[in-house]
Curated annotation (Swiss-Prot):
The gene is ruvA. This is Holliday junction branch migration complex subunit RuvA. GO terms for cellular component: cytoplasm; Holliday junction helicase complex; Holliday junction resolvase complex. It holds the Pfam family RuvA_N. CDD domains: UBA_RuvA_C. Homotetramer. Forms an RuvA(8)-RuvB(12)-Holliday junction (HJ) complex. HJ DNA is sandwiched between 2 RuvA tetramers; dsDNA enters through RuvA and exits via RuvB. An RuvB hexamer assembles on each DNA strand where it exits the tetramer. Each RuvB hexamer is contacted by two RuvA subunits (via domain III) on 2 adjacent RuvB subunits; this complex drives branch migration. In the full resolvosome a probable DNA-RuvA(4)-RuvB(12)-RuvC(2) complex forms which resolves the HJ. Residues 1-63 are annotated as: Domain I. It comes from Desulfitobacterium hafniense (strain Y51). Residues 143-153 are annotated as: Flexible linker. It comes from the Bacteria.
Length: 201
């Protein structure tokens, strides 16, 4: 099974890209957020998942292990296929998806193309308990109602928690970021947050 690929972007298509790995081109479906950042010749490391069907082998790529894990969790829900799971990640990102499920926010989930009320209810019913703690960690982050900002902040929050900071420390550091940080990558947001944390030590 292919668990990870490292290579250069060869071609970008409507909803896929081709990754050149030592002369072999792998076609992967990836979230739109990642697709928008990819450029031909740019090196990417993707966490991957393979889905085998009778007439097709489909490869999906993700920017982090957490993104892949969420994709697989959604696939475990009855009625959620890879297209729907990828659409949710593309529209909401990791943080907003987890927060919407944990808070039973059907309205937000049904904003995703192809996700109706019944599908949103199934997602909530089967997955909400898994995300209760993570939703608490996201509470109080400035701009949490904004899809792009919350998505960036949630991934930065997860990174800071993984580095050993408490929820309170991470939350305060992210709240202190300027509004312009919304346009930054997760790595850049984490770097700014770490500077803020170092200054308070």
């Amino acid at each position: 099974m292919i668990g990870m690929l490292r290579g250069k972007v060869w071609e970008i298509q409507a909803d896929k890209l081709i990754l050149d790995v030592q002369g072999v081109g792998y076609q992967l479906s990836i979230p739109y957020g990642l697709l928008g950042k990819a450029h031909p010749g740019h090196e990417l490391i993707l966490y991957t998942h393979v889905i085998l069907r009778e007439d097709e082998l489909a490869l999906y790529g993700f920017s982090s292990a957490a993104e892949k894990e969420l994709f697989l969790l959604m696939l475990s829900v009855s009625g959620i296929g890879p297209k729907a799971a990828l659409s949710i990640l593309s529209t909401l990102g990791i943080g907003q998806t987890e927060s919407a499920i944990a808070s039973e926010n059907i309205t937000l989930l049904t904003k995703v193309p192809g996700i109706g009320k019944k599908t949103a209810q199934r997602l909530i019913l089967e997955l909400k308990e898994k995300f209760k703690g993570r939703a608490i960690a996201l509470e109080g982050i400035e701009g949490a109602g904004s899809l792009p900002q919350a998505a960036f902040h949630s991934e930065a929050m997860e990174t800071l928690l993984a580095l050993g900071f408490s929820q309170e420390e991470a939350k305060k550091a992210l709240q202190a970021l300027p509004d312009s940080a919304q346009a930054l990558s997760t790595e850049e947001q984490v770097r700014l947050a770490l500077r803020s944390l170092a200054a308070t030590k």
